[in-house]
């Protein structure tokens, strides 16, 4: 099922929407130079983690998945596999799980939580609330 159209607010409709990498970047990764820049950084992070088999799900939220022409950055939630061990990562990949370094080096905001965590549902509920306290959609990207 394709990603839904934007609401009048510029957000996706409430819910967790699914997209593969191709559909995700086709929808959100072009239109302005800033979108292309953010998409390039996001694509790079996906390419770094995909072959490692450590990610169960990738959830994207925030201005990158809105109609906003110039999103400042992308916001990612890495939902890691239960066997995930950050200490086994290369330095290049480890920075993608450090909020300060990921922001500085890739211009992305990151959170991570293990798959099966009792707090995952609560976290997703929180991420789906805008600064104006309205509900918005999130996108789960299938790597």
Regions found by a protein language model. Give the residues of each.
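Catalytic core of pol beta-like nucleotidyltransferases
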Residues: 1-59, 65-72, 80-143
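Aromatic/basic-lined ligand-recognition segments
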Residues: 77
């Amino acid at each position: 099922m394709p990603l839904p159209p934007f609401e009048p607010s510029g957000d996706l409709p409430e819910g967790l929407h699914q997209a593969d990498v191709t559909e995700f970047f086709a929808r959100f990764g072009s239109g302005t130079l800033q979108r292309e820049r953010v998409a390039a950084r996001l694509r790079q992070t996906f390419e770094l983690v995909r072959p490692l088999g450590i990610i169960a799900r990738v959830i994207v939220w925030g201005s990158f998945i809105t109609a906003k022409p110039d999103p400042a950055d992308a916001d990612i939630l890495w939902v890691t596999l239960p066997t995930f061990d950050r200490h086994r990562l290369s330095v290049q990949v480890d920075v993608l799980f450090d909020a300060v370094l990921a922001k500085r080096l890739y211009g992305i905001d990151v959170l991570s939580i293990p798959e099966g965590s009792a707090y995952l549902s609560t976290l997703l509920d929180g991420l789906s609330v805008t600064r104006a306290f309205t509900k918005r959609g999130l996108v789960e990207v299938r790597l």
